Amino acid sequence: MNTMTLTPGQLSLSQLYDVWRHPVQLRLDASAIDGINASVACVNDIVAEGRTAYGINTGFGLLAQTRIADEDLQNLQRSLVLSHAAGVGDPLDDAMVRLIMVLKINSLARGFSGIRLSVIEALIALVNAGVYPLIPAKGSVGASGDLAPLAHLSLTLLGEGKARWQGEWLPAQTALKKAGLEPVALAAKEGLALLNGTQASTAFALRGLFEAQELFASAVVCGALTTEAVLGSRRPFDARIHAARGQQGQIDVARLFRHLLTDTSAIAESHHHCHKVQDPYSLRCQPQVMGACLTQLRQTKEVLLAEANAVSDNPLVFADAGEVISGGNFHAEPVAMAADNLALAIAEIGALSERRIALMMDKHMSQLPPFLVKNGGVNSGFMIAQVTAAALASENKALAHPHSVDSLPTSANQEDHVSMAPAAGRRLWEMAANTRGIIAVEWLAACQGIDLREGLTSSPLLEQARQTLRERVAHYTQDRFFAPDIECATALLAQGALQRLVPDFM
């Protein structure tokens, strides 16, 4: 199990990926403690002095003008958590819940939230014990923060709701007891600090980014395989072409293709003096299209990494000045827009892959047997596999519709513009699954195409990609049940079988 020392505000993308992929033992760096304690002292001073401050001794949302008596402050925070735990839909899996929890801890430990160290440590204890609150997938509009998901997370701290422990759903009180933990009672400001924030939206989009990175790398490998399978030219990847345009993503993608294809191969030599002048766009323009996608991935990474380390609470406690200031850091518009742009990239990666599959089906374009199988007519080969890829690509076009342009006012128009970031991030998962299915079909098709070149081989890395598939999926000599092969190739992609062939590109 990974051990991680959390220095608030300094999480890296690789650390976030590890948190998503694996259970973690978390430890808070001691440098955070003074800031946490100072913010709590500031909140305590406000209460003691009888000053009015939003979220500390007032109601919430449209009820912000309602002053709460000191004796009701603890009940106020508990009531907030209970009432806001109103999510619906399937529970998030343990990996997603773990990522949300670590993001929440990272934000709270920055020392701007007025939440006690003991509560932050209780959250850390949940992560370390593998107690995962039941968080429904739906119910947040991404402003004022991810209220419903984070309320469900916070329920477990109070011993309410349900949680998973060692793979079993249990009443939260029972899960805590089995893990040797105790519920906590919240003090002034703490319920709001737990609920306000963009951590669910950010976690949703981060998963989309992690999957998009794998898809991008896999698609570049499969694009190179297809280039070889249909006797495509290496010339469009010449560095001089891309330097002349100056788009960095395009330059870097062309470099990846040169790395994978190398200068030549037995296949390339076999058509060195062919009559073709230019390849179709789906081959020739791969650096331009995939380069644009890479640029979106990089920009999304920049936004999400900043948000993962951000303080997205409200109000914020500035202990050095003794002030509590209301703002709008809970508004997840940066995450929503980043997720929308990432959706375009995921859709285009799949769309270009589908076009390359279609190219291989056409004997006039590919110079291969129709649908990549001998004895056509008796055998249908990849005919319907390409239809499946087309169906998935079409679904992604609809799913790529932007969410950040939508808004519905909530809380009696007090919260009159929202981001829809959770939905923007969550749909990326379905899009990624669709695109992975498309790339799986291309991998199968491209390897079949190279097989049909009768003993000619590609570059060492591309031959490794072909061998990886052939260890699990045999060459098609005649029709057979196709779906298990797509499923197998899809699983290999998800495990990073092709991604590991590509140098770091982010």
Curated annotation (Swiss-Prot):
Example of a GO cellular component annotation carried by this entry: cytoplasm
Name of the coding gene: hutH
Keyword Ribonucleoprotein assigned: no
Main location, first listed in the record: cytoplasm
Protein modification: Contains an active site 4-methylidene-imidazol-5-one (MIO), which is formed autocatalytically by cyclization and dehydration of residues Ala-Ser-Gly.
Covalent cross-link site, 5-imidazolinone (Ala-Gly): 143-145
UniProt cross-references to HAMAP family, sorted A to Z: His_ammonia_lyase (MF_00229)
Catalytic activity, reaction form: L-histidine = trans-urocanate + NH4(+)
Lineage, opening ranks: Bacteria, Pseudomonadati, Pseudomonadota, Gammaproteobacteria, Enterobacterales
Biochemical pathway: Amino-acid degradation; L-histidine degradation into L-glutamate; N-formimidoyl-L-glutamate from L-histidine: step 1/3
Entry keyword set: Cytoplasm, Histidine metabolism, Lyase
Cited CDD domains: PAL-HAL
This protein's record includes keyword Cytoplasm: yes
Organism of derivation: Salmonella newport (strain SL254)
Protein name from the UniProt record: Histidine ammonia-lyase
